[in-house]
């Protein structure tokens, strides 16, 4: 029994140092104070307006502890009908960081839609690198 206690202590000590891999099954990046997904930006507007557009409090949809905001009722209805299409890939984590083995929340202002899927990035140059070779990042993430 002492061995297992020692092993548990060692694992507890090194666990935070191990890189964390996120997958598409990870929760959506959410503001811990407001509960808003992707900082309240409208995920549908990236597709319909080709723009990062702040959602409005009167057009919200909630589920699984996450609140999504939308620019209008039409965008809210589209998202509710097809969240798998409009929700950010990798839960909104930056795929270029996932390739390096770390999770870093994407910034909704740095984005790209490729292959009819939304990807968020934490830096502009990460978005540019991804856009230049999306296949590489998607196979490695």
Task: Locate predicted features.
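N-terminal export leaders
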Residues: 1-6, 12
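Charged, low-complexity intrinsically disordered segments
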Residues: 15-141
